[in-house]
């Protein structure tokens, strides 16, 4: 068994389809159990059945929705379009090098508020370049230190 096969089995990514057994409840038969036992048993069966159905998650639907948008706004008016992409849960990389510094600052302020409102994140990834992400995208690490060191060593 190769590494790839073990990996797929661990994360349940095998191509085979698992058969799920469904239990059909039979009509209740009258028996002489005390009232407390009768009341608890059907609820426990129902709860166990619901827990099995709630544990199934489709990973393919999560993977298809990830998109990243690259934008280079020319004016502050385009900030709302960028915010709309974030509201649709798409990550956005914004290049502000071709816009006046005052307007670039206003765009960053606007997007900072947008990102805060949706629970996302904004990070500077280079001079005049920002990454804005919604709450479904996690940013790990930092390349700003690396960019700073590279520009210091070349100057």
Swiss-Prot record:
Ranges of compositional bias, category Basic and acidic residues: 22-46
Subunit structure: Homodimer. Interacts with FtsZ.
Family of the protein in this entry: Belongs to the SepF family.
Gene3D superfamilies: SepF-like protein (3.30.110.150)
Entry's Gene Ontology cellular component terms: cytoplasm
Subcellular compartments: Cytoplasm
Ranges where the record places region Disordered: 22-54
UniProt source species: Shouchella clausii (strain KSM-K16) (Alkalihalobacillus clausii)
Any one GO biological process: division septum assembly
Protein name (record): Cell division protein SepF
Main localisation: cytoplasm
Keyword Cell division: yes
Pfam families: SepF
Keywords carried by this UniProt record: Cell cycle, Cell division, Cytoplasm, Septation
Function: Cell division protein that is part of the divisome complex and is recruited early to the Z-ring. Probably stimulates Z-ring formation, perhaps through the cross-linking of FtsZ protofilaments. Its function overlaps with FtsA.
């Amino acid at each position: 068994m190769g590494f790839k096969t073990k990996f797929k089995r661990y994360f349940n990514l095998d191509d085979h389809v698992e058969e799920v057994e469904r239990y059909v409840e039979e009509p209740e038969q009258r028996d002489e159990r005390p009232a407390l036992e009768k009341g608890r048993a059907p609820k426990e069966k129902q709860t166990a059945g619901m827990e099995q159905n709630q544990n199934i998650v489709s990973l393919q639907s999560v993977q298809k929705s990830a998109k990243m948008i690259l934008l280079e706004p020319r004016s502050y008016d385009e900030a709302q379009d960028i915010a709309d992409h974030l509201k649709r849960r798409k990550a956005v990389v914004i290049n502000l090098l071709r816009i006046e510094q005052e307007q670039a600052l206003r765009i960053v302020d606007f997007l900072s508020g947008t990102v805060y409102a949706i629970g996302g994140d904004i990070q500077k990834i280079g001079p005049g370049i920002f990454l804005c992400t919604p709450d479904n995208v996690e940013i790990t690490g930092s390349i700003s230190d690396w960019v700073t060191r590279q520009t210091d060593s070349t100057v």
